[in-house]
Amino acid sequence: MMPLMALGQSNFNLSLIGSFDWPTTEGSDIWGWVNPVDGSEYALVGLNDGFACVNVSNPTNPVQEFYISDINSTWRDVKTWGNFAYITTEADAGLLIVDLTDMTGGTYWHVSNFTHPTNGSSVEFTAAHNLFIDEN
């Protein structure tokens, strides 16, 4: 049993130099974003009970910039487009859109209705397991 455990712990020439713990929740997704103005690097983390933005510019000392509480869900997926983070969940919370230029976490929207692009009708969006953004 011991040789299998040692094999399972291979680090592939990686070293842990910092970490950040959330004592009350678990994560389900992580995505990266770089601030185009100052080059600061951020980990965007989908948590069971919300969304967090962690500054990892100094990887030995990650700092949580903000946290947005949301409906509890095992799955939360994060993607970015420009300076915005888009977060989906299976918890019927719609789409969370966060303006990443506001590091206070105060600029965000929960969206559950969209206007159809061709006929103008309202289209309801409540939940999704995953999110993909076509950059083209």
Where are the regions a protein language model picked out?
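Feature marking well-ordered beta-strand scaffolds used for ligand recognition
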Residues: 8-136
